[in-house]
Amino acid sequence: MNANEDERLEYFRTLLAERFELAPEDLRPDARLYEDLDLDSIDALDLAIVIREVTGRKIDPQAFHQVRTVGDVEREVRRLLVNL
Amino acid sequence: MILTLGNRLDSLRRSTLAGLCSIGFGAVALFGVCVLLPGLLLITPPSRRARRVRGLASVGFRILIRMIEGCGLAKIELEGTETLDTEGCLLVANHPSYLDAVFLMAYFPHVNCVMKPALLNHPLFFPFTRLGGYIAGSEQNPLKLVESCRVAAARGDTILIFPEGTRTTPGKPLHFRRGTAQIALRAELPIVPVVISCDPPALTHGRPWYRMPSRRVRLVIRFHTARAITDFAEESPSALPRMARQVTRGLESYFVEHLASSTRETTHLS
């Protein structure tokens, strides 16, 4: 992970907090998107859009389906950033 | 309210009447499904079918309302109907009782609504719920739901929606889910707030027909002026997920405020 990737990840967290009205402290790695952070099925679509905005790439639907926690999403974002 | 013997007998009498109305409506629905609906389908061209089916359903609901009002179970009062134009709008209503949905389906002859899967598969009503061109409720494909609403509104349908997603639980605060806001924002539909009060509570969540109250139910339905959903936002336009959250809160506060003032009015009258 280089500095640019760290920056992008930080930007991702900022967008997440802003778009879904979350406090930075809510974004713990084990925080569950649906149960803890109150995201619903339509938010999931917007989340995919945020991922695209930050990484410039679309997340694989299969991978996205497995995502449950903030940690899961960040891992996917990292993966997409690294493969650039 | 003290539960005197008189009250209990009244309650029992009203519950019996409610039961009879349910059976009566069941018979009407059965006749509708077996005789009237096939007849209607035979003489209606496909393009007009869905609308006519909804019109027929509305007749059934009107009969039910007549029965309910006729035997003194409920009295329904309307306000704000003078300049009411709901074409292409979302009718956004709170949902204290079964009666409010029944009444709104009766009052607006071709009203559309989001049909729950349970109703699409209902053993008695499914011919109506499936042929009426109602919007299919779908958790799996929310954007399709939004698009269906957009299309329906574009052809002039009035779309009834309950932000709570179910009947209000008495004693618990109003809780609006975000679906209504998402639909209104993404399909860009004006909304008509419909504030409904039901006193005393009847046919609420957890109160079936055999637990009717001991006095006549007064259902007051107030139509407010149509407005943009963004009117309920706290800040100027921002990203959709954020807007949906703000607007849902704004909508909820609006209803809480207006329900509180209507309760105050009722208390003063009685």
Residue ranges of each PLM-predicted region?
Chain A
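Generic structural marker for isolated residues within well-ordered, non-membrane alpha-helices
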Residues: R13, D30, A48
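Thiotemplate assembly-line natural product biosynthesis machinery
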Residues: M1-E25, R78-L84
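Residues in well-ordered alpha-helical elements
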Residues: E25, L45, V70-G71
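Phosphopantetheinylated carrier protein domains
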Residues: A44-Q66
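Phosphopantetheine carrier-protein modules
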Residues: E18-D38, T55-A63
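Catalytic nucleophile serine of serine hydrolases
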Residues: S41
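C-terminal structural segments of small proteins and small subunits
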Residues: H65-N83
